[in-house]
Each structure stands twice: as structure tokens, then as C-alpha cells.
């Protein structure tokens, strides 16, 4: 398998992140009054609401909604005046209700951006050929472009909301590449599609088998104390181009959330987790390739190394004439590889519809 630097000379990686953050500053769960603590005895902090028993009605946590508004303002998002909760159906043991309460097309915060400064070895990871003269622009123009998109798309979204009852996507084809400075550093605006509220799933412990991995465990135990924990999920547009950019974005977002006081953002404890979506395309092409989603990126190093491996793996498959399938893969840091977890679900598989409760 080729090295990452060699692969990125011929292939362009297209990366988007889904970052889940537990609102650890709160005392109770998202839709009930159960204590928010993962250190108690397993299944000690549960009730009919978080277990989805018949007749139990959820009540939104006001402080959780205030926290997501703070996060949206800090990331230059447009705060929506009207939003809805939806049911996202899937059948895994860590979700007792067989659906997750989340948000649909209209989230609490949408269409923001963060400017990402990339310097030193991180800047060197992105090849010079990614910055053609025809694409280059000044740092000030790049930032203004992102801000202009944020303003123009807000107007478009409002019009779409009146016409179709939901927010449509926006065209960002005019978002250009950044210009590399003399020292090799550059700044790139990373667009944020949405920040929405959802409840966390239960914690699963995989026992036995080789190194206790999910793929070889003898049995799995479920602790529902974490079920119903308020989460915010931030979804970026696929604007990241290297594993180092993804790592730096995650670090910057963590600093923002810690400063806001909405979460401790401890990746060791799992209060901040990241899923990476990555695809490849030949340099100069505009059509996106087939993406894979990476799980178990539970540290900054795992985020970088997992994405780097997957980029090299996809390049090897494509260069040998193979096909990349849309699937969810699990990063195994001990073996430094990704393995298939499941074929990726589509939106139809989730049967998303407004939560009547």
C-alpha cells in the first residue's frame, strides 16, 4: 500500500465530519429527569421515557436547547426560529425504543463556518498541486467568500422554507481553494451544514474474543445509563482535504465547546466522538466518489490515522480496478486498519418522520 503523501499527489481526498458532543454540563437527560451520570451501576439511571415504554411522553430539556444555540452562534451558524424533532428508526441493541429522537431537515443551527489555520507539517500534508494559479485567492477573499455564502444561503433557505416546507441545500461550487503563504501555511473556511440535537444510545461492552473487539467478541453487554443523554451533532460539508485538516478542525471545535462550558469534550470518556466520511477522486475531477464512513475515531490520533489508512486503502482498490462500496467501517488502532461493520444505510432505511410526541 502506498504512503499517504504519494497517494495525495494523484488523488484528492474529500472528507466530511460528523462530530457528536455530549452536553456533560447538564444534570439530567434530554427528554426525562433521569440523572446524567455514566459512573453509577449499570442500568441504574433509567425510566420509562428513556426506555421507550408505552405511554411515556418525552419533555425536551430547556438547558440542552440553550447549549445548542450557544454552539451555533460560536460557529457562525444561522439560528432557526422553528425546528422539529424526528424519529430515526434503526434496530440495534443500544437503542431500546428502536428509534432515535433527533432532528429532521430543519435543525436548531444551520449554515455556519469556521476558518481553519493549517501550518507546519500539517500544511505540507496537502500537496502543492492542490493549489493551481487559476484556483488561488487571497486569505481575505476566502473568508469573505465563506461569509458571503452564509448570508446568501440564509435568504435562499427562507425562500425554500416557504415554498417546500423545509430548508433546501445550497450551491457552494464557487467556494475556491485557499492560497498558500510563503511559509507554506494556509487558511481555509470549513462550512458547517448543521448542528442538531439528538439523544445518545446506550453503552455496549464487548466481552471476550480477540482483544475484546466488536468483530470477535464472545458476548456484548448493554448499559442504558447513557441512553437519552443529550447530544449535539455537528455536520460539516465535505470541505476537508487531508487527515491533518480534519484533526485540526476537531481540535478547534473542542476548544470552542470547552470555552462555552457546554461539555468537557473528553474523548477518553467518550463525551466527544467523531465519524469521518471520506471518498477519493482523481485530481482535476469534480464528481464525488463513493464514500465510506469511519467509526471508532475516539482520539485525535485515531482520527488522523484512520482517515489516512482509508485514503490509502481506497486508492489501492481504485488503482487495481476495484469498486468502493458505500459502507460503515470500524478503525482498529491496534492493527492500524479499517474493517467492514455494515453496508451503509440510506435515508429511506431510517424511515425518518416527525415525532408525534
Give each language-model segment a name.
Residues 130, 134-136, 142, 146-148:
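Low-complexity, intrinsically disordered tandem-repeat tracts enriched in small residues
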Residues 1-133, 153, 163-357:
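Basic, nucleic-acid-interacting segments
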Residues 142-147, 154-159, 173:
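Low-complexity, intrinsically disordered segments with a bias for serine/threonine
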Residues 2, 145, 149, 158, ...:
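Surface-exposed charge patches in extracellular/virion surface proteins
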